[in-house]
Amino acid sequence: MRIPSHHATDAVEHVFHAWDAALGAKDLDASMALYQPDATLESPLVRHLLGIEEGIVRGRDNLRELVAQVFAKEPPQRRRFRAGFLSDGNRVTWEYPREADGGEQMDIVEVMEIRDGLIQHHRVYWGWYSVKLYEELQRSARLG
């Protein structure tokens, strides 16, 4: 097992904190500046928001379109409470648990792989509560 250097871990954590701040501020330019030009993002939302078959966005320009829609359509259950994160010097992983201070929130786990100080791959995994909320939104959109 390779133990990451403090420098590598610090760089990954810096990207994570900068991304978290940009997400909280809904700052599209700041968040996009943290991704490699050929970055990928995998999420259940990709198919829904971009209307494509695959759940993967490739490239910063396509990612910008997705993140702009996420910022515009974020449901109230998408709070951002988390207890911390894990990093191995190349990737960072964190969880938004369903049970959070103040009630339930969307249960999500995210993983980012960092290359040369920028996000290369970003994967988003949903728990059952997030899927349930998504299905309810889909149902109400069809009925509305």
Segments (PLM) and residue ranges:
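Basic side chains
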Residues: K26, R60, H122-R123
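A beta-strand edge to alpha-helix "cap/lid" segment located at domain peripheries
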Residues: M1-H7, R64, A68-G144
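N-terminal/domain-start segments enriched in small and hydrophobic, helix-friendly residues
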Residues: D20, V57-R60, G102
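A solvent-exposed, acidic/Ser-Thr-rich amphipathic alpha-helical stretch
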Residues: T9, A30-D88
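Generic alpha-helix detector with strongest preference for long hydrophobic helices that associate
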Residues: V12-F16, P44-H48, T93, A100
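Short, low-complexity N-terminal intrinsically disordered segments enriched in polar/charged residues
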Residues: M1-P37, R139-G144
